[in-house]
Amino acid sequence: MEMPRRFNSYCPNCDEHHQLEAEKVRSGRSSGMKWDARRTKRANASIGNHGRFSKVPVGNKPTNRTDLKYRCSECGNAHLREGWRAGRLVLQE
């Protein structure tokens, strides 16, 4: 799916319509061993099913959701919106 990089839309910070620039959100840094430490503690428990699922989830969705950040040209603040499913997203100039 092709989408324009710059378009006029509503900015919730300015409370007005301005030109917004869309950019793909990069993945953030992982926060150390927090999740893994909890998982290890659950797995080493002596009672129950050791933190395992009864049926392992398998398979991937055919498409991914878009993850875009919209930056206002007037105030410079960025905001997020709910994404949609698209096979491939290309931002046009």
Swiss-Prot record:
Residues 24-62 are annotated as: Disordered. One of its GO terms (biological process) is translation. Its cofactor is Zn(2+). Zn(2+) binds at residues 11, 14, 72, 75. A zinc finger (C4-type) spans 11-75. GO terms for cellular component: ribonucleoprotein complex; ribosome. Gene3D superfamilies: 3.10.450.80. Coiled coil: none annotated. Keywords: Metal-binding, Ribonucleoprotein, Ribosomal protein, RNA-binding, rRNA-binding, Zinc, Zinc-finger. Pfam families: Ribosomal_L44. One of its GO terms (molecular function) is structural constituent of ribosome. The keyword Isomerase does not apply. Binds 1 zinc ion per subunit. Binds to the 23S rRNA. Belongs to the eukaryotic ribosomal protein eL42 family. Part of the 50S ribosomal subunit. This is Large ribosomal subunit protein eL42. The lineage of its organism: Archaea, Methanobacteriati, Methanobacteriota, Stenosarchaea group, Halobacteria.
